[in-house]
Every structure is written in C-alpha cells, then in structure tokens.
Amino acid sequence: VDLKTGARVEGDLNPSSDTETHLELYNKFPNIGGVVHTHSRWATIYAQAGRDIPALGTTHGDYFYGAIPCTRKMTPEEIGGVPGHYERETGKVIVETFEGKDPDAIPAALVHSHGPFVWGKSPADAVYNAVVLEELACMAWQNQLMDRDIPPMQQELLDKHYLRKHGKDAYYGQGKH
C-alpha cells in the first residue's frame, strides 16, 4: 500500500482491514518499516485487562526499554463512524499512549480490550518483536501469578540490558539489527 494514501499499489488482494491504524503508526513513528497486529494469547490477555506488561527481568530488558504500555479505552466517538474511522482512531490512541515514550525503544503497544500492535525497522523485525512480546507477556503473567505485587526490575539493570544491546555504545550480541 501507499504509506500516504493507503491505496493498494500492487497485488490482487485487499490490504489489512487495520491499514488505517498501520498508516497512522508509519506516519507518526518515522523509524518503523513494518507493523504487525496479532491477537496472540498472552499479550491479548493483558490488552483485554487494560494492563501494561511490566518490565520484570532481563529478558524483557534485552528487547524493550520499559513496560509495554496499554492504551486507554477508546471512546464511543472513536469507535463509531464511517468505515476506516475506528481503525484510524486506534492508531491515534496508540500514538497518544507514546507521548513521552520512545517508540523505537518500546516497539509495541497493547490496545485496550483489543490486542497488540508491534513494529520494527522492517517487516521481519516487527514479526520478531511480536514473537518476543508474546513470550514476555507469558513470562510476566506467570511471575504475577507467583507474586501479584512483584515490582518492576531495577532501572539500573534495565538500563544495562537494553543499552548494551541497543545503545550508542552497544557491545552485546552479533551487532545491531
């Protein structure tokens, strides 16, 4: 699809019914090159509960620089309207949720009562981030079963794990991807 208009530019199939959401993200988050929307079990559980996925351990910190936020509930006005309106408003609610947050460092959002939208530098990167998100959601759920009031990981540990892999002086792993 054309990222400005949403018009199909090749192929015979219609684009996703969530194209307007994707376009809002592409146009507001300039570094993304792919968007994935799933209804994966564990991340959707958090979305339906209206809860962020907390950063509880180093696995989370290796990929996401903080809690994965859940949007507010959408208003009846945002949900109603002509075809495409709801989907465009969904994108706007995600963008609103990221005011003061870095969408490159936290490449996912949970849409309240709906499910996750995940992005990356490329379509493959977005899919990878969606797989990681689902594993983090499952791990967080299990941790919260053990301790409902489990605190988030130490900020210093989150900084170390995220920045050694993604920071300007990254040294961990096989290079930036």
Task: Go through each PLM region and give its residues.
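Glycine-rich flexible loops
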Residues: 1-177
